[in-house]
Amino acid sequence: MSKIIDGKKIAKEIETELTSQVSLMSVPPKLSVVQIGDDPASASYIKAKANAASRVGIKLTHHHLSKEININELEKLVDKLNKTEDGLIIQLPIPKSLESVLERIKPENDVDGFHSENLGKLVQGIHGMVPCTPAGIIELLYRSGNDPEGKHVVVVGRSTIVGTPLSLLLSQKGVDATVTLCHSRTKSLHEHCKQ
């Protein structure tokens, strides 16, 4: 049976909770977002992040860089931000030649949870930074009264950003869903999704 989740209502609840938590901190958290190039979708995502950060009291700094930046310059910036910021996001997509910089972010500063150490912890069921979208999906499930324990969940897509981390989170002890991970080569996808 289908159930529509009121994501806006839940987001507002979470925002209220975060605002309260941040207000109790002696120093507000500092987050830097690094954008490379002029992708319109990236600009839109960053604007939404900046607005949300402002509403809860997080200090966000946007570093907008040319797509012509070289890896050495980018690594220097990331090294500097690793020392001064509480969190760091490299807004994707970025040129393939610069992707190695994601491993340069200190795992504890890796807000997106893309660093191989954080993904490795996720595989092992060890606490660490988790990719935001999968973590948000789990939070939505629980807050909407949809406990996945013992249920069969079909995840469509196996990206390292959403699908694979989500399937790992769902199957961890404490969440305990049975997961089928479908992808572009899955036969009869519609049959899996109807289950």
Regions found by a protein language model. Give the residues of each.
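Short beta-strand elements in bilobed, periplasmic/extracellular small-molecule ligand-binding domains
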Residues: 53-67, 177-181
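Glycine/small-residue-rich loop that forms an oxyanion/phosphate-binding "nest" at active or ligand-binding sites
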Residues: 92-135
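Short, ordered loop/turn segments at secondary-structure junctions
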Residues: 36-38, 65-67, 93-95, 106, ...
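Short beta-strand segments enriched in small/hydrophobic residues
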Residues: 28-38
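Short, well-structured alpha-helical segments in soluble
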Residues: 73-84
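Periplasmic-binding protein-like
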Residues: 85-93
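Glycine-rich phosphate/diphosphate-binding loop of Rossmann-like nucleotide-binding domains
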Residues: 38-50, 96, 128-195
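Positively charged, low-complexity intrinsically disordered leader regions
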Residues: 1-27
